[in-house]
Amino acid sequence: MESLRDSHLCEQEQSRSIMTATAPLRLGISRCLLGEEVRFDGGHKRDNFLTEVLGRYVEWVSVCPEVEAGLGTPREAMRLVGDPQYPRLVTIRTGIDHTRALETMTTNRLAELKSLDLSGYVFKKGSPSCGIERVRIFSEQGKLSRNGAGLFARAFIEQFPLIPVEEEGRLCDPTLRENFIERVFCYRRWQDLVQSGVTKQALAQFHTIHKYLLLAHHPQQCEVLGRLIGQAHLHRPKELAQRYGELFMKTLAVKATVRKHVNVLQHILGYFKKRLGIHEKAELLGVIDDYHHGLTPLIVPLTLVKHYVQIFDASYIRAQVYLNPHPKELMLRNHV
């Protein structure tokens, strides 16, 4: 039987293969989050996780819409004013309207970003140009609303609806962090497939290796995707790719839960339960139950599952992205 050490080495190879299969992995980011002094007050909002940890695995493409629109640093603070659907970017003290300058910059910058094939984007929370949600918008009479989005972020999401986006503040939540980074790597794999050509056979293989990951997010939509694969002959390749890609990313955006992870782990257990001894099966069921009751993080049952996958040479399970959706060095599943 294969030792735990051999199992660990194989896991390292799988972790490396995630990177080689998806490189280059480019992510957009608000420039201030990298420590550049581009904020209105001349300061920055450097994020250590993004720069020191995730930065080892991605190539950052930094953008500061306000600076690139020619507004300078430091500059007068600005806010969004008017109709929440079509707000204007206005300086707080002098009331100067910079909307047109930012819109021109946005149009030009989005055209540049399209050619860079981004796999995700991290925006600055609350920014009138970069906030994704709950950005403050004021009526003409000064009444405050928090239902807005930054002008640049909103335009980016409209033009690139499949690209995973998140705000740096929300990435402090371990579950949201793991979900975002998982989606980034999945989207990169999807981009690779699209670029190589989406044949029916290639799409079926892509779906197969992502099946358990999809089950952890939304079992019903995983079934819908499976039916789409089964009816691939009814669709033109381009239409099939578009429909699958949209639903694939929509499914992954649904938050995985402990209950759904337990369901997936039990599916995996069922794959080789007849080959497990009584004590081995009891041990695996025990760690799954501990995870279910919040006594251990997800990494604990997964580690034991991976060990048995290697021992029994379960190639179908080994190929599942669910086991290694992102580099283990990020330790994302140590906290969920």
Predicted regions: what is each one?
Residues 88-108, 112, 144-209:
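Divalent-metal-activated hydrolytic enzyme cores
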Residues 126-156:
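Short Gly/Thr/Asp-enriched flexible loops that form oxyanion-binding sites at enzyme active sites
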Residues 165-336:
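Acidic, Ser/Pro/Thr-rich low-complexity regulatory regions
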Residues 26-33:
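Short, hydrophobic/glycine-enriched beta-strand segments
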Residues 34-42:
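Short N-terminal binding/cap micro-motifs at the start of the first secondary-structure element
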Residues 65-86:
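Short, surface-exposed acidic-centric catalytic microdomains
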